[in-house]
Amino acid sequence: MLLGVFGIGGFALSNSGAFAVEQVTVSGADHLSGDELTELAAVPAGSTLLNVDANGIATRLAANPWVKSVSVDRVFPNTLNLNITERSISAVVAVTVDSSNTVERWALSSDGMWLTKIPDDRNSAEGKALPDSVYNDAENALEITDIPYGSTPEAGSYCNNSNVENALGVIDGMTTELAGQGKSVAAASSDSTTLTLQNGIEIAFGDSKDIRDKERVCLQLMKEHEGKISYINVRVVNKPVWRSV
């Protein structure tokens, strides 16, 4: 009987005006504004901290490609906090989108999701619609180039281009020591994937298999022949080829 009383009391409390959601706050977001996320969350009017549909809110937020995960936290007495973990830009991909060789630049996350198109003109209406953080992060990300025509990026979808996936595997498979020196990756095919370092050295990795072993060989050659190497081929990791400046 006592449990029944508590159950009825809890139901009544959750459906009363107690602990009404009066404020929605956002934490952890960098590429999305608080207003954007609050609008996307669409917390129903009249919600309380006791009856709010946290799963529904999380599902709506996760529909945005920047949102990797989210927790909806109740902060009593009247605040709902949206704690966002965002995807980050792992690479910027120059994609040929039509037979006229029109190229678009797209931000790609480390898990292979297309995040957003990055307009070349930052001052255009489309460019101004993006936060500065997108352009700032894009400037510091590796660029993947030479992608053959055929890919159709769409924000929120996962990349299914094998050339891009292999290039991403090369980028994410390297340690910071070499990855931090990267400038761009040419990915005309999986077998010919080539990384260009900031110092101009080109490294032909080929496929991303055995990437740590390939990286180790490259670092060793660069150390042994410092300032003298312009090209390294480690497509076959146990038979490296290098060319001097």
Residue ranges and their predicted role:
Residues 12-117:
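Terminal hydrophobic membrane-targeting helix
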Residues 1-8, 71, 77-245:
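Charged, solvent-exposed interaction patches on well-folded alpha/beta domains
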